[in-house]
Design a protein with these regions (language model features):
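N-terminal active-site segment of His-dependent metallophosphoesterases
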Residues: 1-59, 63-78, 88-89
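Extended active-site neighborhood of metal-dependent phosphoesterases/phosphodiesterases
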Residues: 61-179
Length: 180
């Protein structure tokens, strides 16, 4: 039997007390109940949208490592994908590239062919610079390299138990899509 923990919306850089409380209690609970897992999946929004400063706090790195330790795994069994809050949506050229690609279905992207122009992928990729720095504090260089090719925004990691397809759902997300 495979056991995993799925976490999302950690929202570091946010001072909401309920968010902080839930985050703080999870590792304690896992240790107290001696819950062991084979894998952890972290599906984005590690930080709050367009955090200021636009960085990932060291606390978020330590937290994910602590969760791995609490359930008895190493970080190679932690799988992370960026959420819409984990990218810098204000990077120069990013919004313009997304508009060219697909904004309100007036862009050039056709799902039948699945092609996005290299210049546009590079512009979008710049919004993930801090996310990749964050990952480099958790993963080996080999693992970080999988996140480091703007022309291959999606990738697969094979494990002994299954394959994990990492889908970059932030490719076409703009700051104007943020819920109020």
């Amino acid at each position: 039997m495979i056991r995993w923990l799925h976490i999302s919306d950690l929202h570091f850089n946010d001072d909401d007390m309920s968010t902080i409380f839930m985050r703080d209690e999870l590792p304690k609970y896992l240790k107290e109940k001696d819950i062991k897992c084979d894998y952890i999946f972290c599906t984005g929004d590690i930080r709050t949208a367009n955090a200021s400063p636009n960085i990932f706090q060291e606390e978020s790195v330590q937290y994910l490592i602590e969760l791995c330790t609490a359930v008895g795994i190493t970080t190679d069994r932690l799988f992370i994908v960026a959420g819409n809050h984990d990218v810098d949506r204000n990077v120069a050229g990013r919004d313009e590239a997304i508009r060219r690609i697909c904004f309100q279905r007036n862009g050039y992207y056709n799902p039948k062919y699945g092609k996005i122009k290299e210049d546009d992928l590079n512009a979008i990729y710049e919004g993930q610079a801090e996310f990749r720095k964050f990952l480099s504090k958790i993963y080996t260089d080999d693992r970080v390299s999988k996140y480091s090719d703007p022309l291959k925004p999606h990738f697969n990691i094979e494990t002994d138990d299954f394959n994990v397809l990492h889908i970059d759902s932030t490719l076409t997300y703009t700051k104007e899509q943020e819920a109020v």
